[in-house]
Amino acid sequence: MKYKDLRDFLAQLERQGELKRVAVEIDPHLEMTEICDRLLKAGGPAVLFEKSRGHDIPVLGNLFGTPKRVAMGMGQDSVEALREVGKLLAYLKEPDPPKGLKDAWEKLPVLKQVLNMAPKELSRASCQEIVWEGKDVDLGKLPIQTCWPGDAGPLITWGLTVTKGPHKTRQNLGIYRQQVIAPNKVIMRWLAHRGGALDFRDFTLANPGQPYPIAVALGADPATILGAVTPVPDSLSEYQFAGLLRGAKTEIVKCLTHDLQVPASAEIVLEGYIHPDETAVEGPFGDHTGYYNEQETFPVFTIERITMRRDPIYHSTYTGKPPDEPAILGVALNEVFVPLLQKQFTEIVDFYLPPEGCSYRMAVVSMKKQYAGHAKRIMFGVWSFLRQFMYTKFIIVTDDDVNIRDWKEVIWAITTRVDPARDTLIVENTPIDYLDFASPVSGLGGKMGLDATNKWPGETSREWGKPITMDEVVKARVDGMWTDLDL
């Protein structure tokens, strides 16, 4: 099913029992985090806090707290169907040349669909029904959560940050947390390799001393939100990809402050600039690792206007020890990653990011091994293929007889097929998440690969063990008598 905006999505969730309303007054300071954390860990519904203490605006939480709701947001009926999204992305990333006229004809609808998905710019939009400017700009009037007791202050978590580089034709959408430090100022925490930070760097080099335009959209439609966290090919904008998911063009509107374009149906939009050399120390905040992060310096975003729909909804989340909402997103997007990896490495059978691994820090891969040393090739391939995996610290590779989504089987493979000295690959001084305080240097650390495959000649001089399996005829015979055994 497709959704024109966030409210359309919420109405469908409510019809299916996937959204509950809370009429009791709840404090955005800590209380909402505790409620959403309990709901998520129980596989519970999204929640709309209708009365946020001290505010007139309701708060939406736990929206993508189950893989099912992530799939629904992408317009799919099931988590398994997300593989089709991955296949589409794999094709768009590296299109196969047609094998003949028939093949070209079959691929034509996909190509036409992509070409027709350029966003549609509107002259007026619902996200600009109400405008705060000048002294009316006050983030304190928004029910921004303070998530954990040790947090430095309120934190905007689900904002889609819109940026544009000086040499790019398309805009970039990214999700970066933003600490509120004044009624009209937030700290824009983006890592140096992320799209928004790269756009900002290129702009400052090309336009020294000039303020950099920024917009942040809160409460966009689900396809646009999820498009911002999906590995979209560089040749495709997130707005185009959202249009593909939705089956209709993404409607956008030009900001009132500058020329950036934002989702027309967004609930709330922050417009403004990053001024040259204005930075601030960010944090600490509880993060998806389950720890408070170190303080670091990032640019300050000064907000000149806040626009919104009538009766807006504030979309929020928290991050904490997994599982949290980013971890659940990782579980669902895992299915998108599989076809992308299989396109590049046809020997890969399955790929799994355990949610306990903070969304991306550990990966398990099963493969059809073809030669000695093959597992190490896959390790380096995963680390280098997608930007999402450059921070993956641990990769375990198994044969395709192992169900890598069952930890019992993975541990069996590790304990029976791994020699620590031979099968452990250590790579030093590689890019690591800045939030990873276990690394000896901020942003730089080691990676480890475990080869838990059966070993081939050249990898061992010993006769390799043969797994025990029961005769299929005997299994079938016992199946037939099982009911009569009354066991």
From Swiss-Prot:
Keyword annotations from UniProtKB, A to Z: Cell membrane, Decarboxylase, Flavoprotein, FMN, Lyase, Manganese, Membrane, Metal-binding, Ubiquinone biosynthesis
Function according to Swiss-Prot or TrEMBL: Catalyzes the decarboxylation of 3-octaprenyl-4-hydroxy benzoate to 2-octaprenylphenol, an intermediate step in ubiquinone biosynthesis.
Protein family (similarity comment): Belongs to the UbiD family.
Primary enzyme class: lyase
E.C. code: 4.1.1.98
Localization terms from the record: Cell membrane
Positions of Mn(2+) binding: 172, 238
Residues holding prenylated FMN: 175-177, 189-191, 194-195
Name of protein: 3-octaprenyl-4-hydroxybenzoate carboxy-lyase
